[in-house]
Structure formats: structure tokens, C-alpha cells
Amino acid sequence: WNLREYKKQMKNQEYLKETYEWKDLLAIVHKLRQPDGCPWDSTQTYESMKKCVADEAAEVVEAVDNEDFINLREELGDLMLQVLMYAEIAQERQEFTLDDVIDELAKKLVRRHPNVFGDEEMSRTPGEGLSVWKRVKKEEKTLRKSLPNIAENHIEIPQKIQENG
């Protein structure tokens, strides 16, 4: 990629750099979704992107299977783009942000590795580590299933108090 030659053809040169950082990538994805961005990118939805994310994940697996690590770098970028697009759409809809995704993932990694970040004994084998992950995941899912009932009960209690005055 010859940046100098490419710049001659580009009207919007603020996005052209020799090397990009994370913040640049986020700005590019944001620009693509704007009304003056890309007509295809700006009209994508959660639903319309499902096939894209599945295809990109399959291409990552294929690159690993073929031990094609040059292509793997590109395919990981394509998969990351899908994540960033989903997060950008969510932010537009005021559902969550990329920072929320990062925060939730970091918390999950710490929670599911009490043998690394907590006071549990360190796993000695990969199998033990996976067992810890699965156990904590199961505990989280059980807790999550009980939370809606707790929330519903908390809503009903004030209503019952009002009704019975």
C-alpha cells in the first residue's frame, strides 16, 4: 500500500495514515455508519449482519486449519470489524457501547478465573482450568435465571402495598 499515491486520489485525507491505532479504527467504523458514509455499512442491522459474522468466524477457523497465519491476521481483522459494527449499531440505538462490551468481557474473564485472580487454588492442568470456567459459568447462569423472579417480586411488593394500603 503506497500511502503517497493513494493520498493523491483521496478527497478525505484525514483518515489516511501510515499506521493506525485503536481510536482511528473506531473513528473509521463510526464514519462508515454516518449518512455521508458508506451506503452499505450505514444500512446494516443486527439481523443483516448475522451471515457476515458467521462467514468471518468460519474464515478465521479455515485460516487456522490451513496454518495460514498471514491470512489469519486479515481474517481476525474482518471478525473484529463485525464486533465493532455491532457495537456501533448498539450505540446508535442507545442500547450499549463498545466500552460496555469491553467492561463486561473483562469482568467475565476475572470472574471465571478465580484460580488466577481470586483466592482459589491455581489449576495445574488445562482440564482443571476448563472445569473452573464451566463451574463458574453454570453458577452465573443459575443466578441469572433467578434474577428476573427477584425483580418481578420487587415490582409486585410495592403494588401490593399500594393496593392494600
Question: Each PLM stretch: what is its role?
Answer:
Residues 3-6, 10-75, 81-165:
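Flexible "arm" and connector segments at domain edges
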